[in-house]
């Protein structure tokens, strides 16, 4: 535990185009080397592609995709008497959001489409439909937690 006070959470400003705080946070996750304007171009480009393909509000598709990626439980390593157990723990809401954004960006980067905007749009559309690599990651995490349910009494 830190000896000092915990740093206060900074208020994040909503993004200029859609007025969404979640989207502003996501733009920050996409950003590399402090290049925010490039990240904004990528995310807004992806949302344009999503609106053309899905014929729905892009922000709704984005939020549905994040919701489908959010993990409810995860495993944490805990040492007990020389043995390390994978203990399932519930994921707090702020971490759920952070993990879902991180996984969406991570698996978008691994895709084969030409531009990052196209990759992000494709992964977002798949996640909104409940498939895709990011959703598979969540299912794998849930499966790990289910397999190690026997160790859930080793709470943190």
Swiss-Prot record:
PANTHER family: RIBOSOMAL PROTEIN S7 (PTHR11205). The lineage of its organism: Bacteria, Pseudomonadati, Pseudomonadota, Gammaproteobacteria, Oceanospirillales. Belongs to the universal ribosomal protein uS7 family. GO terms for cellular component: small ribosomal subunit. One of the primary rRNA binding proteins, it binds directly to 16S rRNA where it nucleates assembly of the head domain of the 30S subunit. Is located at the subunit interface close to the decoding center, probably blocks exit of the E-site tRNA. Part of the 30S ribosomal subunit. Contacts proteins S9 and S11. Gene3D superfamilies: Ribosomal protein S7 domain (1.10.455.10). This is Small ribosomal subunit protein uS7. GO terms for molecular function: rRNA binding; structural constituent of ribosome; tRNA binding. Pfam families: Ribosomal_S7 (PF00177). InterPro entries: Ribosomal_uS7, Ribosomal_uS7_bac/org-type, Ribosomal_uS7_dom, Ribosomal_uS7_dom_sf. The gene is rpsG. GO terms for biological process: translation. HAMAP family: Ribosomal_uS7_B. Keywords: Ribonucleoprotein, Ribosomal protein, RNA-binding, rRNA-binding, tRNA-binding.
């Amino acid at each position: 535990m830190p000896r000092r006070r915990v740093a206060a959470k900074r208020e994040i400003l909503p993004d200029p185009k859609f007025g969404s705080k979640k989207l502003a946070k996501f733009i920050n996750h996409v950003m590399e080397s402090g290049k925010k304007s490039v990240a904004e171009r990528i995310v807004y480009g992806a949302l344009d592609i999503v609106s053309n393909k899905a014929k729905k509000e892009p922000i709704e598709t984005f939020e549905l995709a994040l919701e489908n990626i959010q993990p409810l439980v995860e495993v944490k390593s805990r040492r007990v008497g020389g043995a390390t157990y994978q203990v399932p723990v519930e994921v707090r809401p702020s971490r759920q959001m952070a993990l879902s954004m991180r996984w969406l960006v991570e698996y978008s980067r691994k895709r084969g489409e030409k531009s990052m905007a196209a990759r992000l749009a494709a992964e977002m559309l798949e996640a909104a439909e409940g498939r895709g690599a990011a959703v598979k990651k969540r299912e794998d995490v849930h499966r790990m937690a289910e397999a190690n349910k026997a160790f859930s009494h080793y709470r943190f």
